[in-house]
Curated annotation (Swiss-Prot):
Keywords: Ribonucleoprotein, Ribosomal protein, RNA-binding, rRNA-binding. One of its GO terms (biological process) is translation. This is Large ribosomal subunit protein uL4. It comes from Natranaerobius thermophilus (strain ATCC BAA-1301 / DSM 18059 / JW/NM-WN-LF). SUPFAM superfamilies: Ribosomal protein L4. The keyword Ribosomal protein applies. Pfam families: Ribosomal_L4. Coiled coil: none annotated. InterPro entries: Ribosomal_uL4, Ribosomal_uL4-like, Ribosomal_uL4_dom_sf. GO terms for molecular function: rRNA binding; structural constituent of ribosome. Gene3D superfamilies: 3.40.1370.10. Belongs to the universal ribosomal protein uL4 family.
Length: 207
């Protein structure tokens, strides 16, 4: 089982924590991670693109000129897709792009993502993170103490409104709940800052 340093808010090591092999030291499946990222991005698509086909465009019910004898190309409607102002061929319509992966595949993908982060030294674990009030400055100082100056996601075990409000105004920094982790957010941030409680929740939920 991998052992990782445990830090306080001042950036000092206060101990070590042993992580679960089945989550933080599993075989990495890049295919499943790729599929999980695609699933997440697909679910975020608005799917509101819409255009009219030739049957929906106003007008065009009368044949513009007779079939033969004019010397001009034959046409049956001025709303054909080849006419200016005509309908759109294969016009897009509002649709839902979201889909779901099997639960086992989704769980394997998040384990692969967490293992990748740990192997790259991009997981930092805090003994605790308590905030009596929203304080952006405190989060910035904590990240500086931990030598984190890239995109980071702070993961807590339970909902903490003060942490959320303290991170939302820092560019490149976000917060999340341990039981709501997804592969896209894990891989899209350079560092994961996990509280000790968050590790316990992750090992319980994704085991």
């Amino acid at each position: 089982m991998p052992k990782v340093a445990l830090y306080n808010n001042e950036g000092s090591q206060v101990g070590e924590i042993t992580l679960d092999d089945s989550i933080f030291a599993t075989d990495i499946n890049e295919t499943l991670m790729h599929e999980a990222v695609n699933m997440h991005l697909a679910s975020k698509r608005r799917g509101t693109a819409s255009a009219k086909t030739r049957s929906e465009v106003r007008g065009g019910g009368r044949k513009p000129w007779r079939q033969k004898g004019t010397g001009r190309a034959r046409h049956g409607s001025i709303r054909s897709p080849i006419w200016v102002g005509g309908g759109i061929s294969f016009a897009p319509k509002p649709r839902d792009y979201s889909y779901k992966m099997p639960k086992k595949a989704k769980r394997k993908a998040i384990k692969s993502a967490l293992t990748t982060k740990l192997n790259n030294g991009e997981i930092v674990i805090l003994e605790e993170l308590t905030m009596e009030a929203p304080k952006t400055k405190k989060i910035i100082e904590m990240l500086e103490n931990l030598s984190i100056n890239h995109k980071a996601m702070i993961v807590t075990g339970a909902s903490d409104l003060n942490v959320y409000r303290s991170t939302r105004n820092i560019p490149g920094v976000s917060s999340a709940l341990a039981n709501n982790l997804n592969v896209y957010d894990v891989l899209n941030h350079d560092y994961l800052v996990l509280t000790k409680d968050a590790v316990s929740v992750i090992e319980e939920v994704f085991c």
